[in-house]
Amino acid sequence: GPGAAGGALTRPRARGLTGAGRTPTLRQVSLAEGGSMMGGMPGQAPVMVVNQNAQRETGRKAQLGNITAAKAVSDIVRTTLGPRSMLKMLLDAQGSIVLTNDGNAILREIDVAHPAAKSMVDLSRAQDEEVGDGTTSVIILAGEMLHCAVPFLDKKLHPTVIIRGYLRALEDAIAICDELCYPIAEDDEKQLSNIVQACVGTKFTTRFGTLISDLAIQAVQTVRVELPGGGREIDVKKYAKVEKIPGGSLEDCRVLKGVLFAKDVVAPGRMPRKIERPRILLLDCPLEYKKGENQTNVEISKEEDWAALLKAEEAWISARCNDIIKAKPDLVITEKGLSDFAVTFLARAGISAIRRLRKTDNNRIARACGATVVHRTDEIKDSDIGTGAGVFEVKKIGDEYFSFIVDCDAPKACTVLLRGASKDILNEVERNLHDAMGVARNVVQDPRLLPGGGATEMAVATRLQEKAASVPGVEAWPYRAVGAALEVIPRTLAQNCGANVIRTITKLRAKHLEGEGAQTFGIDGNAGTIVDMKELGVWEPYAVKTQTFKTSLEAAVLLLRIDDILSGLSRKGGAGSAAPQKPTTTTGDDVDSEQQLAE
């Protein structure tokens, strides 16, 4: 019992130590009673003492809980794989409806509570940012890898042994992909179009596959920059902007060789709205009198002082405008403000001006027309002026005015203009276009292909089953399980188009066992039949496929390593701390980013 101190930690007492095979009974004391985190008799294992309000799962229970949560997430997106995929209708927090079959878009809208499920959602986001495609496949594969580990956990096989087998299988799977891949010529436009169309063929916009693939390829080829060292940079996210304007039809979508943004000139009546071969000046400084960083008090005793103050402001703005006029630009675009006095000066000189443009758009214009963003007007050089644009024009589309800086000579930035009947359709087309541009970028950077339609997965699975015989010890079980897990992709493709799954997969497995020449056979996602992907023309980029294998297997390994899940109401609150009447949720800095009730 407690000593004289009253609040000291009660030490765990062992009972029945003389009895053979008996284990000591340990008593836990909560931190709220004044205990410390650790306690224990000499020679005994220390006892972790936690808040009574906290929930804790350890050992096999934690592992199975993680696997169940991950499998539940993968089952959500399983029906969205392949050309016969189903759509998901999601109602987001703002009340708007999202219709999509994109794995990342679905999981982004779902609010999950389990930490393992959250890690699966992050997995999809990581895949999307890394290669732009394969978000659904990576979730399905990760869930299946974890599901295949359950029998080994039931047999009390240590997670480290399972992980060792999994990682060994991953190394061999990548090596097999290296053997299976087909190199293509970098300038083979037809082959590149077929690959991107195969990606778009699984999306909502299948009917417009050719249109979207053409848009994606044009955008990627426009922003492609050859680096001095021999490599190439293709920054689609930064330099290929997608502008959605409701109205018209999808056939009106096009890639603009330049930049489009929703702005009008500052003084429409006095500034020209169309300029051929414009000289463009880009600024990152305000053309209005800059207020002091700190609060400034000016004491004015007579009217002349006030007039002098206004004159000083006008002189400052006048000096800046004169610096600009000396450079003889036709169009001035600034990221900051533009005062009425400056507008008068510029309009009198016949210069069009646009203010408060986003920095990202300004950088895009600089890259498209060869300009340099200037930070001070007294530092403007003639080389800073962009002369590469063909035309600047302001057009009214619907109720909004849009500025076009297009027909650039050598644009390294572009805008994809999307038109469509409604915002929902435009949002889905944008998601599909993002995936298509990711695929096109991957092929241009790494021109190697792997057969699609589950052919690569089945070929790797067959080879892993053969190699498993040479793996020593119990590691061979999880090694073989990776091969079995990879078959989930062709199985899901067959399932989603209503084919007899068992019969189809058995035939495909037998076909792949025939050896050379049979490794390109997979599932036709439209009919559910077994066909040669080489003849069908369904290919996937090597970068996407190998990244899918790596990401899914490493995520499965990460979740298998977890043997303890501790979650409480609050990090700071002790036992019995009362919750507020209207609790609010905060993400905090918890290890699993779980939502917590504020104190």
Which residues are covered by each model-predicted region?
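Glycine/charge-rich, flexible interdomain linkers and switch-proximal surface loops
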Residues: 86-97, 137, 183-196, 233-243, ...
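Active-site cofactor/substrate anionic-group-binding motifs, chiefly glycine-
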Residues: 96-127
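Extended, low-charge hydrophobic alpha-helical regions
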Residues: 64, 111-113, 412-599
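Glycine/serine-rich anion-binding loops at beta->alpha junctions
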Residues: 57, 127-137, 449-451
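Residue-level signature of catalytic and energy-coupling elements of molecular machines
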Residues: 82, 132, 156, 216, ...
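N-terminal charge/polar-biased segments
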Residues: 1-56, 559-599
